[in-house]
Amino acid sequence: MKQRVLVASNRGPVSYQFGADGSLVGKRGGGGMIAGVISGLAAVAPETRVTWICAALSDADRAVARWQDAGAVEQDGIPVRMLDIPADTFDRAYNSVANSALWFLHHLLFDTPNQPQFGQGFRRDWQSYLAYNEAFATALAEEALAEDGPGADIRVLVQDYHLSLAPRLLRERLDGASRDIRVGHFSHTPWAPPDYYRILPGDVGRAVLDGMLGADSVGFHAERWAAAFLDCCQTILGAQVSRTGTGGADTVGRVIHRGRVTEVTVHPLGVDVPALRARAQAGDVRGHVAGLGRAAGGRRLIVRVDRTELSKNIVRGLAAYRELLTTRPEWRGRVIHLAFAYPSRSAVPEYRAYTERVIQMAREITEEFRAPDWNPLILEVRDDYPRSLAACAVADVLLVNPVRDGMNLVAQEGPVLSERGCALVLSREAGAAATLGRDALLINPYDVSETAAALHQALVMPEAERRRRSAALAATAAASPPARWLGDQLASLER
């Protein structure tokens, strides 16, 4: 019997919109997690039967969910089951808890003199987050129990902080079912250390940890995030924690809580190099490569590609570029900063304000340094994937300076796509620093002067060294492709 794999995530591999004629038009989902899971599933698909469970995010998605009648649409050959969660429940769970509380927590983003304020409104929102996770747990249990029986081999892969309660809730629904149903949870974010984690209300913080420990395996991109999770389990829950796992080399610890053993593992996500390079040869990307080359006019290019996300640290990156032009005037007229950003989470007030600050600061830098024959900075805030690939291809320097990041795929994709070798200026607070740090220029993301100095060092780096470093970075990114990343998650459930 083929292995059955159930994937659960907030955003799925396909989303729908209504066309002009009222028809439903599907579009492949974006984002690093989605791309990684799709690519990984493609590699294991011949040996597995997969169903992907996700939330309906739009009115069109909800129409599809109702039309499905518990069936599934398909994307990339994967059956997709969308959950029609009430819009107000979804909004509170996604925007008020997942993004405004848990995301801020793990990225250490709270403005603590003012926020957060966990009052009655948050308690209402938390009940919605619980209901949202219950909807996923119920759907996963339905799918799993439909297969339960002799010979059934079912693996559940729960993705990210939106679904931190789902593993425990699923366990409750599987009580008495086949012991061949095993559950994994993977966090694509960092994890907060215990002292910061205690910002959450005590019962909420314990519920999140307890929920994740309903899984047989809990995974992270970097060992430091796994270590912080173990610290929280020990400090907040009083769970029994060991730092040497009983599994494979990717196991960094285990937690015994409520009679269950959970392995804590590390699986860094790299890049599907053949697919990425093939996409970069498409006509739309090549057109952008030519256009960016004309815009550069022979000047050096410092490139960044981000979402307008608070943790991506775009404002300090712009400040570092301004300091470079101020302290190293020899670069005026000889370098251009391409800052390409994707709009992100406009429903969250802090994100709207941050995007406006990015736009304003870019305007100030342009006005301060512009010359008749030179525009020092090109900022575009819109979704344009081909343009982003092209920017990575032509970069002399790639700036990736998040204040905190679970992994960061751009830091890996840039060297893979580079056509002339690029120097990588990388935050030490990105999970990717653990694998790329030897060949990148590591910086403190809060230190604008250090970042400016690293940009200068990258610009003057000898071509041979730049190419050597870029090739080494690309090789590292290729060493953990999505197929291996997802396969390792499945393997961790067999121990």
Regions found by a protein language model. Give the residues of each.
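Catalytic cores of carbohydrate-active enzymes across secretory and cytosolic contexts
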Residues: 1-495
